[in-house]
Amino acid sequence: MKRYMEILAFCMLFMAFFLSGCSLSPTNTGVLIGTNLALSGKGMSYSTSTERGIELAKDMVNDRGGLLGRPVQIVSVDNHGKPEDAEAAIQQLTVRHVSAIIGPDLTDCTRVVLPNVEAVKIPLISPACTQPDITVDPKSHEVYRYIFRAAYIDASQGRAMADYALKQLHVKRAAVFYYPDKTYAQGLAEYFRSAFAASGSEVPVYIPVEEVQDLTKYLSLLQRENVDVIYLPGYDDWTIPAITLLRSHGISQPLLGPDGWNGPKMERDVDISYLTQVYYTDHYAGHDASEAARRFSQAYYEKYGEWPDSYAALGYDAFMMTAEAIERCQSAEAPDVARELEKTIDYDGATGTISLDANHDAIKDVFIMTFKDGQPELAATIPFDGQTQ
C-alpha cells in the first residue's frame, strides 16, 4: 500500500507539472511556505485566524531580512474545509516547490493528506490538530516522517484538566457527558476519566449524550451520585447549549471543557451569570502569559486592530518553528527542513515554550482558562506531565 501511494503521489505531481509548465527547481527570488487552510466553507473562522497569525509571522521575519538572505513568500491555497480539496492543495503546493506546508488545521482534512505528504517528502505542520493519529499511523504505530504539529495532543489536555480539577478545585467525584459521534470528544472523555480515576477519585457518571436536551434525564443522577464537577468535552456548538441547560436547571458545580470551547461564541452566546466556575484547556493564554506572547499579541493588534485568538497564535508558532528550522539547517529544501524540525527544542512561542518529541508532537504546558466578567482569563498553567501518546 505504501508503494502504491508513493506511485500515485508521483503521478499526481507529474501531471500537475506537465499541465502548469512550472519548474520544480527552488525559486531564486524567495523562500516559499505553503498554506493549506479553509479560507471559505467549513472551518473558515478558525483558518482565517490561523492565516492571520501566519501572515504576521511572515512579515516579522521579512522585516528582519527574510530567510537565507531571501524574502519569504506565502503560497496560500483554500481547501474550503473539504478533504478532497485539501488533497488537491497538496498537489498545487508540491508543484510550487514549497519548503514546508502549514495546515490543514481541520482534522478530517489533515488525515486525508498524510499519505501524499509522506510521498512527496514536504514537511507539514498542523497548527491546531490535537488527535493522536495525525503524527502516528494508528495501524502500524510508525511516526509519519514529514508530519508535525504546533498544538499539544488531546491526551495532554485531558490529563491536565483532570490534574487541575483534583489539585486546585479539590473535587472527588466527576461526571462526564460527551457527544458520541465525535472522535475528538470520545478521546478526551476517556483521557480525562483515566487520569481522574488513576488518583483514586471516581467517575460514577460517564454517559454519551447526542441531543443536549437529553441532559435533563440525568439531573437527578448527578444529585444521587453526589457529583462535584462535570466534564463536557466537545466543540462549542454542542457545549454552549449544554452549559446553558445545566446552569438554567440549577447545576452549580464547576463545568470543565477542552480547547474546543475557545473563541468568541462562549462570551457572546452564554449568559455571563452562567460562566462562573467554568474552566477549559487552551493553547494561548493571552498577552500576559509570557514576553513572547506579549510581543505576538501587540504586533497582531497593531496589524489587525484586534486581539488574537488561539488559532492565530498557533498559526504564528507553526510558521516561526518552520522559519527557525530553515535558519538552523541553512537550507530551504523540504527534506532538510523536515530533518531540522525534528530537532526543535525550547522554541519560545506565543503559545508557550515548545519542543517536539519522538512522535513530532508538541511538548508544552497546558493553560487552564476561566472567565472573569465574561472574558477569558488565565486560571492556571499545568506543566507538561512527561507522558506522550
What are these regions (language model features)?
Residues S23-T29, S45-R52, R64-V136, P208-L215, ...:
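Beta-alpha junction/loop-to-helix N-cap segments that form part of ligand/metal-binding clefts
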Residues G30, G34-E55, V77-P83, D105-L106, ...:
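Extracytoplasmic "Venus flytrap"
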Residues V75, E142-P208, V229, T322:
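An alpha-beta-alpha
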Residues A86, R149-A175, Q186, D214-T216, ...:
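Hydrophobic alpha-helical segments within soluble ligand-binding/sensing domains
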Residues L93-D105, P123-P127, A175-Y178, N226-D236, ...:
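Periplasmic-binding protein-like
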Residues P115-V120, A185-T281:
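Extracellular/periplasmic bilobed ligand-binding domains
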Residues Y144, I243-Y316, Q375-T388:
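Extracellular/periplasmic periplasmic-binding protein-like sensory domains
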Residues E302-A312, A323-E377:
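Segments of small-molecule ligand-sensing domains
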